[in-house]
Design a protein with these regions (language model features):
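Generic structural signal for well-ordered alpha-helices
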Residues: 124-129, 170
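Short, amphipathic alpha-helical "lid/cap" segments that border enzyme active or binding sites
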Residues: 83, 87, 121, 125, ...
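A short helix->loop->beta-strand "cap" motif at the edges of active sites that frequently abuts
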Residues: 135-139
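Alpha-helical membrane-targeting segments
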Residues: 1-15, 122, 150-165
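Catalytic His-Asp segment of secreted/periplasmic serine-dependent ester chemistry enzymes
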Residues: 148-234
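N-terminal secretory targeting modules
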Residues: 1-36, 65-67, 225-231
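Alpha/beta-hydrolase-fold catalytic nucleophile elbow
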Residues: 105, 143-144
Length: 234
């Protein structure tokens, strides 16, 4: 499996992060919603040119439409980061003092490293604790785990092993967040079959065989916005 992993890393293009890591959207008359997104390569917008067409910009737009109020948003993300690295390197960079919603996308890199569930749970607890020191009441929403079993660039073996591991980490994340007040995990497992309604072939869901395309970012972000709306926390 290690040899297959090296071949995949060599074959997948090294794409840059998206540009424009902050923005303002919406024309509603309500109080401005302050949003930050935190995470790994998907939140960093790997696979699209700008964050406006990626996850964070689409999420902000969907929330603005859903709530009828403007949204100001900022991205704190880095490709390749595990939950532990996010806590150590990104959380100290957060400049905002007042935030209404925090959305976090993690799990892919911890799965690729085959980090054991106990280590993942500890990293997630540390991450939440670091955020709670700064934002004690702000809703924290963890997005779905990445659909690794659907990645076209991965071999069947890696899809099976790493894909099963990310699902295990998802169950661990659910276990950690369930008793925590105002902390939520969108546990729905992403499958391409769920998104076939947009009438696109499977390859169109990925920019490089691993990272999402603009289409996937936008479908995913709207789905997460719907989940946030159903939570009723805003």
């Amino acid at each position: 499996m290690a040899i297959q992993g090296k071949r995949i890393r060599a074959s997948v293009p090294k794409l840059p992060p998206a540009k424009g890591a902050s923005g303002y959207i919406g024309t509603g008359k309500g109080q401005v919603l302050r949003l930050i997104t935190i995470g790994e390569s998907t939140i960093a917008g790997i696979g699209v040119e700008t964050h406006e067409e990626g996850f964070s910009g689409t999420l902000a737009r969907a929330l603005a439409d859903q709530l009828g109020k403007p949204v100001v948003w900022k991205v704190y993300a880095r490709s390749g980061y595990t939950a532990k690295r996010v806590t150590e390197k990104l959380i100290p960079q957060i400049a905002e003092t007042d935030i209404d919603l925090i959305v976090i996308g993690l799990g892919g890199n911890d799965a690729f490293h085959l980090n054991p569930p106990w280590r993942w749970r500890r990293s997630i607890r540390d991450l939440i604790a670091a955020l709670r020191e700064r934002f004690p009441e702000t809703p924290i929403v963890f997005t779905n785990m990445p659909p690794i079993k659907s990645f076209p660039a991965f071999t069947p073996l890696i899809k099976r092993v790493v894909g099963s591991h990310v699902e295990l980490l998802g169950r661990s994340l659910d276990h950690v967040t369930e008793p925590m007040p105002n902390v939520f995990y969108y546990a729905r497992v992403i499958t391409l079959e769920d998104w076939r309604g947009v009438s696109a072939p499977p390859a169109d869901y990925f920019s490089d065989g691993v990272h999402p395309s603009a289409l996937t970012y936008q479908v995913w972000a709207r789905d997460v916005a719907g989940y946030v709306g159903r939570l009723g926390v805003l």
